[in-house]
């Protein structure tokens, strides 16, 4: 049996107001091609199909079209669970219709194992699928005290109990897979992930996975990575696109699992190539260097985070020219190389209103604060000194 594991599509997500939907369409086309080329029997989507609980209509349309194509219109099984970004009720609302087309949609946590006959391999697949299990979605209060360590221990115990219940339904004559959307201790995070719980209270130990699972398919972390210290192969497939500049330089992929009953799986990573990469530029030679890079066509198809060394603030005209020359600039961040001189000014007898005016000019690209604003600032400073 060949299983493709993907996760964290985040359909509808934007990058500083820029739509990523065309890129998401392209990478879904690529995943569909991989499924067909690699003769995949089952597709698993481990949560965060959408970026918000109320996704735009175009994102929902793309999602259901993708499921239809991945299932080959009912010939291949596809299983989807809700992540922390998904609305569990909304995701599972279409489950009765989807089930008739070999698509399983699970929104709320459950300990019931899904039994699936896979005609293409003539084998049975048992999926212990656990959608994102928050306290509210579990409909349980795990700890009344505001004790993070206690909540973390209780949460891990609860997830372990759910997986243990699933383990009872796993069979030796079937392929046994667990799937969930959660944070496992030790995972490498990045900026585009919304924390599951502040402080890390919703953290699960790899020892909590069902003992008889041959593979654990995970979602939530956007960097593809194996889970350390698990008793069986467990992996985050990662997001198919880079969604923050903290992911710059990281490859994106889907995971393919070749597995038979009672046998250890063979895990392989299939790299993805679609979508615009996220790239960081550091221009230490100022604007001239940036103009040269643009003329050379450097990273022409990328989204770019630009940090540029300057002695004076960039004018609005200079900023507009950069964006006109290349629409891929997401951030343009001036780095003032005379910052040390500014710091020294603070230690001298330069009037506070002069320092404020300089700061305002740097922050606004050359703008001048009004006299009313300067007086308000001085008033606030005086009040702070009185305290």
Labelled PLM ranges:
Residues 10, 40-58, 75-89, 184-200:
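Active-site neighborhood of divalent metal-dependent phosphoester/pyrophosphate hydrolases
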Residues 6-7, 43-48, 77-84, 104-109, ...:
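Active-site neighborhood of phospho(di)ester-bond hydrolases with catalytic His/Asp-centered motifs
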Residues 1-68, 75, 375, 379-383, ...:
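N-terminal active-site segment of His-dependent metallophosphoesterases
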Residues 14-16, 49-66, 82-101, 107, ...:
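Metal-dependent catalytic neighborhoods of phosphoester/phosphodiester hydrolases
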């Amino acid at each position: 049996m060949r299983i493709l594991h993907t996760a964290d599509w985040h359909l509808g997500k934007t990058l500083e107001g820029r739509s990523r939907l065309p890129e998401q369409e392209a990478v879904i086309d690529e995943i569909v091609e991989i499924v067909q080329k690699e003769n995949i029997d089952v597709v698993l989507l481990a949560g965060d199909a959408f970026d918000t609980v109320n996704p735009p209509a175009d994102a929902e349309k793309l999602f259901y079209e993708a499921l239809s194509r991945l299932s080959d219109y009912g010939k291949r099984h596809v299983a989807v669970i809700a992540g922390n970004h998904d609305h569990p009720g909304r995701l599972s609302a279409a489950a009765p219709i989807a089930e008739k087309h070999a698509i399983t949609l699970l929104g709320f946590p459950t300990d019931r194992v899904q039994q699936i006959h896979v005609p293409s391999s003539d084998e049975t697949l048992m999926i212990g699928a656990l959608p994102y299990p928050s306290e509210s979605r579990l409909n349980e209060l795990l700890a009344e005290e505001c004790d993070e360590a206690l909540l973390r221990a209780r949460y891990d115990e609860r997830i372990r109990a759910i997986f243990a219940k699933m383990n009872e339904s796993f069979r030796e004559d079937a392929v046994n897979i667990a799937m969930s959307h959660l944070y496992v201790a030790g995972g490498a995070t990045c900026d585009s992930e919304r924390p599951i719980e502040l402080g890390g209270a919703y953290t699960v130990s790899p020892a909590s996975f069902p003992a008889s699972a041959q593979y654990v398919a995970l979602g939530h972390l956007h960097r593809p990575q194996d889970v350390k210290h698990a008793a069986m192969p467990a992996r985050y497939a990662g997001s198919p696109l880079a969604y923050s500049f903290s992911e710059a330089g990281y490859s994106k992929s889907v995971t393919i699992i070749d597995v038979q009953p009672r046998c250890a799986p063979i895990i392989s990573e299939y790299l993805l190539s679609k979508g615009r990469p996220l790239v960081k530029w550091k221009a230490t030679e100022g604007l001239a260097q940036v103009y040269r890079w643009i003329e050379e066509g450097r990273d022409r198809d990328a989204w770019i985070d630009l940090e540029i060394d300057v002695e004076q603030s960039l004018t609005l005209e200079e900023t507009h020219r950069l964006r006109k020359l290349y629409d891929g600039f997401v951030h343009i961040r001036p780095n003032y190389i005379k910052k040390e001189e500014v710091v020294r000014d603070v230690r001298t007898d330069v009037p506070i209103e002069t320092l404020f005016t300089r700061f305002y000019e740097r922050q606004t690209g050359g703008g001048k604060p009004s006299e009313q604003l300067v007086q308000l600032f001085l008033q606030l400073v005086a009040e702070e000194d009185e305290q």
